[in-house]
Amino acid sequence: MDTIVTPSDHRAEGEAVSTASPRDYFDLMKPRVMTLVVFTAFAGLIAAPVDADPFLAFMSILCLAVGAGAAGALNMAYDADIDATMQRTRKRPIPRGVVSVSNAYGFGVVASILSVLLMALASNYLAAGLLAFSIFFYAVIYTMILKRSTPQNIVIGGAAGAFPPMIGWVAATGEISLDAVILFMIIFLWTPPHSWALALYKSGDYAAANVPMMPVAKGAKSTRLQILLYSIVLVIFAGAPVLTGLGGAVYGATSLGGGALFLLLAWRIFRSRAGEAGSAEEGALYAVRAGDKAARDLFAYSIGYLTVLFAALIVEHAFGAYVAIPGVSP
């Protein structure tokens, strides 16, 4: 049985940690997550109905990237015990012993403050306020409160990851509009099926770390059903930009085709035995492995789905490819 490493253990070890490289601090910012954050924020900024100053737009996106990275660093600092326990996260900078918990906290706090202040100077106070709130929501509300206490952690905490396109929109326009809320809601609804697909085939990892993800707390069968239900709502809601005129024919086709495949993969999970690795039934091993593959497929595809969906908005608004859909677009 693995030994659980507590935050205090890492805090004590942190004093002896050698000087980390810039790459270690970059890894602390969760660069893969940060990339998707920046991309969706850029889509929100580009889709906004104004011509933003290129330099100020660049600075706004940079501030959002730093803010997202700062939130990631604070998350890793607080979750040092969990990361040391889970196979998926053991190679992160803190579990590897190259960055101390105290240094990660310091880095996260300083980067958070700088990103918010620069956003206020480069863009507007509303965008800066939303950035500050999203950092707080992820680092405190989700990481410190929800993640370890409720299987709804991802549902509620997903709001933090849904803010980037809204912040990009507000950075350009200075106001929150219906379209900005729609972009927020698309990511908010996307987060549960995306995260629970991962949690299904990594349920043993989460159970070992005592993280009450949905498969651990409510079981694999309930999780598979909820993935399907959230996927249906997501795919339907993803068509909303067409109804408001934000998305045109390119976006509509992307949403329709991408959504159909999303639902197919979600249905495969629902009909599978994903997340039942502990099943003792005879002959269950093959079915469970096939189910876990279905969960892996949806997890991987969901990232591409969201990327292509927002890329369609960029193509329409940045490259003049917007074509209204007769009888649908206003």
Curated annotation (Swiss-Prot):
Domain of life: Bacteria
EC identifiers of the protein: 2.5.1.141
Subcellular location(s) of the protein: Cell inner membrane
EC class name: transferase
Pfam families (alphabetical): UbiA
GO cellular component, one term: plasma membrane
Membrane topology: Multi-pass membrane protein
Keywords: Cell inner membrane, Cell membrane, Heme biosynthesis, Membrane, Transferase, Transmembrane, Transmembrane helix
Membrane-crossing residue ranges in chain numbering: 33-53, 54-74, 101-121, 126-146, 154-174, 180-200, 227-247, 250-270, 308-328
The keyword Membrane is annotated on this UniProt entry: yes
GO MF annotations, alphabetized: protoheme IX farnesyltransferase activity
Gene3D superfamilies: UbiA prenyltransferase
GO BP annotations, alphabetical order: heme O biosynthetic process
Catalysed reactions, as listed in the record: heme b + (2E,6E)-farnesyl diphosphate + H2O = Fe(II)-heme o + diphosphate
Pathway: Porphyrin-containing compound metabolism; heme O biosynthesis; heme O from protoheme: step 1/1
Subunit details: Interacts with CtaA.
Extra information: Carbon 2 of the heme B porphyrin ring is defined according to the Fischer nomenclature.
Stated family: Belongs to the UbiA prenyltransferase family. Protoheme IX farnesyltransferase subfamily.
Role summary: Converts heme B (protoheme IX) to heme O by substitution of the vinyl group on carbon 2 of heme B porphyrin ring with a hydroxyethyl farnesyl side group.
Protein name, as recorded: Protoheme IX farnesyltransferase
Recorded name of the encoding gene: ctaB
